[in-house]
């Protein structure tokens, strides 16, 4: 699968994450048929144009934390605006907020 079709598949999956839920990079990789390639999901989301409608902000790391340094504040604000709360360590409770695919 080429990057273009792989990225399209990743974007399609991410669009299914409902408002108020999150998924992990690894979870998206598994659903995209590339288990163990969480970084590829990160590369795909990083490639999105600014005006994209893909809810990239709903994808976080396996520890329930935001991985992006450059957009950390924006991602945090977007998630909070959807009703997702963070604990004192800036971690999201995956048992409560993780999307069950």
Task: Please name every model-derived segment.
Residues 1-101:
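Nucleic acid-binding interface residues in structured DNA/RNA-binding domains
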């Amino acid at each position: 699968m080429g990057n273009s079709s792989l990225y399209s598949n990743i974007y399609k999956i991410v669009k299914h994450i409902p408002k108020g839920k999150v998924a992990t990079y690894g979870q998206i990789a598994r659903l995209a048929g590339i288990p163990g390639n969480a970084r590829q999901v990160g590369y795909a989301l990083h490639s999105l144009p600014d005006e994209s409608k893909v809810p990239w902000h709903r994808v976080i790391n396996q520890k329930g934390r935001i991985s992006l340094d450059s957009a950390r504040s924006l991602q945090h604000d977007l998630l909070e605006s959807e009703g997702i709360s963070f604990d004192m360590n800036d971690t999201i409770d995956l048992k409560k907020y993780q999307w069950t695919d």
